[in-house]
Amino acid sequence: MMAAAPIQQNGTHTGVPIDLDPPDSRKRPLEAPPEAGSTKRTNTGEDGQYFLKVLIPSYAAGSIIGKGGQTIVQLQKETGATIKLSKSKDFYPGTTERVCLIQGTVEALNAVHGFIAEKIREMPQNVAKTEPVSILQPQTTVNPDRIKQVKIIVPNSTAGLIIGKGGATVKAIMEQSGAWVQLSQKPDGINLQERVVTVSGEPEQNRKAVELIIQKIQEDPQSGSCLNISYANVTGPVANSNPTGSPYANTAEVLPTAAAAAGLLGHANLAGVAAFPAVLSGFTGNDLVAITSALNTLASYGYNLNTLGLGLSQAAATGALAAAAASANPAAAAANLLATYASEASASGSTAGGTAGTFALGSLAAATAATNGYFGAASPLAASAILGTEKSTDGSKDVVEIAVPENLVGAILGKGGKTLVEYQELTGARIQISKKGEFVPGTRNRKVTITGTPAATQAAQYLITQRITYEQGVRAANPQKVG
């Protein structure tokens, strides 16, 4: 999925286009529809180079890079191309795919892309299946159809050449290659700098289609106008990676909260899911907007909320997802969403570890259901998790205190305190952990104090108990794991 652009050499402009037609094919009259592989004057000399920008699923990136970067170095040496990938967590907006920019001759672009396509087709079996695990365990479930797709990002000008007058060129590309070629939607309002081309088919069909698309890149003088591999700081709208739906990918201001949710809730692909049922009984006005906004935010970034094990009751989920207000605060919306799920779980009844009513708003009961009963009645955390819930001195905020076993505090903190910071950013609550050696009297438990709005404190409490529950489950399955 890359976009290729010409680099002029010594001011020469004579082109050497690729001709996919057999040598004995007859030339068509000028008035006939354009061939997908037609040979218009190109913008570079015989030694000219171009750029191709493509999307690479996260599961394939490692095999393309290789151990210590050996594979990608060897690929560059063999093809003469230069290959750049966005950083491991720097995804194209609205996806969990990395951006790859290839620079080289037409032959090199085709060779490198052929290698990348092969690695994408090698989807590991454990990536394609979903297991009933804690929502805090990272997941990489991918749409199985992705292995048959190529996603190329091209400048808007190149997209016009690929489509052709009245769609004649893209039709010819499909006819000659046998692949299905679609472009992301063209917006009525703000023009996009780039469009995403999705090619679907068998390996050989996709290979031919990509060669024809690279020809169009070769013909466009502006095809090298968008050479960024990171979209983290791009202002304004960005093209949707999918050919259907909105022309635009997720906006930059939504991504930070959704990205934080990625690490906290675990990833599961939701491609093609248009909406969640979310007419919640007992919620109206701003509350409903916040909750539905959170659903939209997380779903649009690819997170399957159904895997939380906290599905809303049928009575509470009887309609289509309300349109999220553009002004809604994503962090507050996510907090409200988590709080709502926990409340629904509380109302659903008891769990293996005890009754839901034992714990404030059912959040620990929810955690039990979501983690296959790892959080049983014998758990020290289950026995004394909630130390107290009260209002702050000024009465404006809730204060929740939780007891956490000393040997599990590290799971909440994360490396360098990263997990704790993410929890606070996602929920808007303030989370404090007692100093090392300061225990709840008579125990070896540290005290965790959560301060914030009711929704924020409950969301933070829920995330903390989920993390602890997951860590306990991992240790139960692997007794050798410590700390």
UniProtKB/Swiss-Prot annotation:
GO molecular-function annotation terms?
mRNA binding; RNA binding; sequence-specific mRNA binding
**Which cysteines bridge via disulfide bonds?**
none
Gene Ontology BP terms? mRNA processing; nervous system development; regulation of alternative mRNA splicing, via spliceosome; RNA splicing
Which residues lie within the region annotated Disordered?
Answer: 1-44
In terms of PROSITE patterns, this protein maps to: KH_TYPE_1
What subcellular compartments does it reside in? Answer: Nucleus
Q: What are the residue boundaries of the KH domain, all occurrences included?
A: 49-116, 147-213, 397-464
InterPro entries in the record: KH-I_NOVA_rpt1, KH-I_NOVA_rpt2, KH-I_NOVA_rpt3, KH_dom, KH_dom_type_1, KH_dom_type_1_sf
GO CC: one term? nucleus
Please give the SMART domains that the UniProt record associates with this protein. KH
- Segments of this protein annotated with the region Required for RNA binding: 395-479
Q: How does it assemble?
A: Interacts with PTBP2; the interaction is direct.
Could you give the domain comment from the record?
The KH domain consists of approximately 70 amino acids and includes a conserved hydrophobic core, an invariant Gly-X-X-Gly motif, and an additional variable segment. The third KH domain (KH3) binds a hairpin RNA loop containing the 5'-UCAY-3' motif on targeted molecules. RNA binding by KH3 requires residues C-terminal to the KH domain.
Classification via PANTHER family: KH DOMAIN CONTAINING RNA BINDING PROTEIN (PTHR10288)
Q: What does this protein do?
A: Functions to regulate alternative splicing in neurons by binding pre-mRNA in a sequence-specific manner to activate exon inclusion or exclusion. It binds specifically to the sequences 5'-YCAY-3' and regulates splicing in only a subset of regulated exons. Binding to an exonic 5'-YCAY-3' cluster changes the protein complexes assembled on pre-mRNA, blocking U1 snRNP binding and exon inclusion, whereas binding to an intronic 5'-YCAY-3' cluster enhances spliceosome assembly and exon inclusion.
Q: What is this protein called?
A: RNA-binding protein Nova-1
- As recorded in Swiss-Prot or TrEMBL, the protein's gene is named NOVA1
